[in-house]
């Protein structure tokens, strides 16, 4: 039966996504020292509020680091660029108000739960809420209509379904941001062939913006990385974005330790 077969494929896909999410969740306990260091250094230099973070990752290291800034003496709020059901409930995630730091999760997030019934999105602050679907499904119900939610995770495959309204909203905000930006810094990103959506969005911005050309800087080295891997990666970036890409031999950790030193080398 075609219908049953199709449904089986859909269910299998959901299980694979949950399995991937569980694997990532188990890694969440790793140290996010350098995320905190980067945020602290940008804040110290008064650059944080002029910085927009775009993440292709599902983990919530950078999310939790930015969200942790919200306190009375430094009330910076995290803005994902989408509305959550939590906004309508007291003592829950608050609607961001200025001053804000924007974080766009273009492939979804471990702390997002989507309701296909009422088309709403719930955030589970500081927690990979997707795990509730495996560990305690009653805790994975929509805040608005009490139906069971599903993950928003776009798998790292060539075919990516970007039709979800919240995902498409995030992508629209990213493109708008890039059109107004002067510098795009890639950290820990290999410019994979599977990320064709990202490549062509950047190319579209690069070829149609009215401002001065967008500048690019890459930090994706690490101890023991092979020279041929570095060379192929640099060729991949420059083949698509042009020879003006500044491809450093530095790591994300080095950038996080002193971001201003690197940023100052760029004429903006």
Give the location of each predicted region:
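Cys/His-rich short segments
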Residues: 99-100, 105-165
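Helix N-terminus capping/helix-initiation residues
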Residues: 1, 155-156, 251
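Short secondary-structure junctions
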Residues: 73-74, 122-126, 240-249
């Amino acid at each position: 039966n075609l219908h049953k077969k199709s449904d089986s494929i859909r269910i299998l896909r959901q299980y694979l996504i949950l399995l991937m999410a569980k694997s990532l969740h188990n890694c969440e306990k790793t140290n996010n020292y350098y995320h905190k260091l980067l945020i602290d250094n940008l804040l110290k230099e008064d650059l944080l509020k002029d910085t927009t973070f775009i993440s292709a990752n599902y983990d919530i290291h950078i999310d939790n680091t930015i969200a942790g800034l919200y306190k009375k003496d430094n009330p910076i709020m995290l803005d994902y660029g989408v509305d959550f059901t939590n906004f309508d409930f007291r003592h829950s995630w608050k609607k961001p108000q200025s001053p804000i730091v924007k974080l766009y999760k273009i492939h979804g997030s471990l702390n997002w739960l989507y309701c296909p019934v009422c088309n709403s999105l719930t955030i589970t602050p500081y927690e990979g809420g997707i795990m509730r679907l495996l560990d305690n499904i009653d805790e994975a119900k929509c805040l608005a209509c009490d139906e069971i939610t599903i993950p928003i995770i776009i798998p790292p495959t060539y075919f990516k379904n970007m039709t979800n309204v919240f995902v498409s909203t995030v992508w629209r905000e990213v493109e708008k941001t890039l059109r107004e930006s002067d510098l795009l810094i890639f950290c820990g990103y290999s410019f994979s062939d599977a990320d064709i959506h990202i490549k062509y969005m950047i190319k579209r911005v690069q070829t149609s913006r009215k401002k001065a050309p967008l500048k690019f800087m890459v930090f994706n080295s690490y101890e023991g990385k092979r020279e041929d891997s570095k060379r192929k990666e640099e060729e991949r970036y420059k083949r698509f974005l042009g020879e003006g890409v500044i491809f450093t031999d530095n790591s994300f950790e080095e950038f996080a330790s002193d971001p201003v030193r690197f940023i100052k080398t760029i004429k903006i």
